[in-house]
Amino acid sequence: MNEEQRKAGTINILAERDRKAEKDYSKYFEQVYQPPSLKEAKKRGKQEVQYNRDFHIDEKYKGMGKGRTFLIKTYGCQMNAHDTEVMAGILNALGYSATSDINEADVILINTCAIRENAENKVFSEIGNLKHLKKERPDCLIGVCGCMSQEESVVNKILKSYQNVDMVFGTHNIHHLPEILEEAYLSKAMVVEVWSKEGDIIENLPKVRDGHIKAWVNIMYGCDKFCTYCIVPFTRGKERSRRPEDIIDEVRELAREGYQEITLLGQNVNSYGKDIEGLDYELGDLLEDISKIDIPRVRFTTSHPWDFTDRMIEVIAKGGNIVPHIHLPVQSGNNQVLKIMGRKYTRESYLDLVSRIKEAIPNVALTTDIIVGYPNETEEQFEETLSLYDDVQFEHAYTYLYSQRDGTPAAKMKDNVPLEVKKERLQRLNKKVGIYSQQAMSQYEGKIVTVLCEGSSKKDENVLAGYTDKNKLVNFKGPRESIGKLVDVKIDEAKQYSLNGTFIQEHQRSMVTQ
């Protein structure tokens, strides 16, 4: 999709701040804004994705931020963290300086998450808390961006109740931040620019990475799976893959800069490459090419079981810098619930995939996501989730109560599992999660593990902390020079969700040759 096509899907809203709240805000939309629609989204056909490698900031915007500061608050997934790095890079290029003091920031951006109702509530609370700041410092700009901005109901709520917000923009037009800022400075009205359809892939965007040890590397955008509970296909758009050469160049540059670990990101990384016409190249091929680059650790997230290929298993099994940790969300252990969720696999096919992974990679650490209390979930169906957990023996799981999201097919289902029942099931599941986590941790007692030291422990400045290749948190006392390096640590104590150990030495590793 080129820029002219993109403009056809652009939404611009100018809402007067002092206008009284009204129930219908459609009059503020210069073009019709379509709310998330499964029917319409599924109609999105294959469109040629344009790759823009010539991103630059117009000279007229440079210096816009001279003498001004910015702060970005980030909610949600790793993709949002990556988007924040890009926005920080653009703001730096405009002359802004970062600050950690929200009371001093001249530009405040709230990068939002729409995956669960609780996340949205936190964001609205945050925006509300900024009302007093806007009164005290009317010249500061407050912006709301990220996935929540792609929802019409959210935009309407901001228009109605949060007139302290100066600008709202979505996930597809971050590279237009200079133009959005300029409009916000010049206008006395709220500026909302939300692209209802995904855009081109923009390369060479500036980034301010969070630290110099680990880095996010986006390999694709969007999702075409349409799980019935998930808003992501609507807020992030259709699947679009970056070109392999662009990804590999970025990873090589990170290796030259001394980064010790990268994580390949996508809403569904297993679909990587499928949308690139004339290219027979999948995630397994990308992993193999990246394994030849001298960077100690390579991770990827998130995987959908339906797309997990034998080629991927083969490459991970070779070892090297591809870590033996696979996050494989199952969501439920019951076939009927999985079908209603639109997950496209069965309990049996999932367990078969796990069996193939474990056979090829005996030392693999498997983790997962599980939703409890999906509409119509019975006690017997939930118990099948518990039994699947026993079968797989995941080393950790992220567990959630079902959260209804407006605009998804599941929102039309009756949320008929009582909250008390949901909480009781979650408690039982988490008890099992703790048991298997303790079991996984206990095997490390007395052993020496390699840890990527990331800094001081959150609980004790005198203790260092880092993660193993299987993503186990390790706390240990050692020299400050260990920060940013791979070190060997002897494990003295295995706790349920972390390990305590003693520093041995800096880890000696062999170079990867291309």
UniProtKB/Swiss-Prot annotation:
Per UniProt, [4Fe-4S] cluster 2 binds at C223, C227, C230
Does the keyword Zinc-finger feature in the UniProt annotation? no
Residue intervals of the MTTase N-terminal domain: 68-186
Key word Iron-sulfur present in the record? yes
| Residues binding [4Fe-4S] cluster 1, per UniProt | C77, C113, C147
Give the catalysed reaction(s), semicolon-separated: N(6)-dimethylallyladenosine(37) in tRNA + (sulfur carrier)-SH + AH2 + 2 S-adenosyl-L-methionine = 2-methylsulfanyl-N(6)-dimethylallyladenosine(37) in tRNA + (sulfur carrier)-H + 5'-deoxyadenosine + L-methionine + A + S-adenosyl-L-homocysteine + 2 H(+)
Extract the SMART domains matched here: Elp3
Keywords for the protein's UniProt record, in alphabetical order: 4Fe-4S, Cytoplasm, Iron, Iron-sulfur, Metal-binding, S-adenosyl-L-methionine, Transferase, tRNA processing
Among the GO molecular function terms of this UniProt record, one is: 4 iron, 4 sulfur cluster binding
* Domain TRAM residue range list: 442-505
* Residue stretches making up the Radical SAM core domain: 209-439
* Cofactor(s) of this protein: [4Fe-4S] cluster
Database matches in InterPro entries: Elp3/MiaA/NifB-like_rSAM, Methylthiotransferase, Methylthiotransferase_CS, Methylthiotransferase_N, Methylthiotransferase_N_sf, MiaB_methiolase, rSAM, rSAM_horseshoe
Sorted alphabetically, the Gene Ontology cellular component annotations on this record are:
cytosol
Stated EC number for the protein is 2.8.4.3
Transmembrane portions of the chain: none
How many cofactors are bound and how? Binds 2 [4Fe-4S] clusters. One cluster is coordinated with 3 cysteines and an exchangeable S-adenosyl-L-methionine.
Q: Where in the cell is it found?
A: Cytoplasm
Q: Which family does it belong to?
A: Belongs to the methylthiotransferase family. MiaB subfamily.
Record's function text: Catalyzes the methylthiolation of N6-(dimethylallyl)adenosine (i(6)A), leading to the formation of 2-methylthio-N6-(dimethylallyl)adenosine (ms(2)i(6)A) at position 37 in tRNAs that read codons beginning with uridine.
What binding partners and quaternary form does the record give?
A: Monomer.
What is the designated name of this protein?
A: tRNA-2-methylthio-N(6)-dimethylallyladenosine synthase
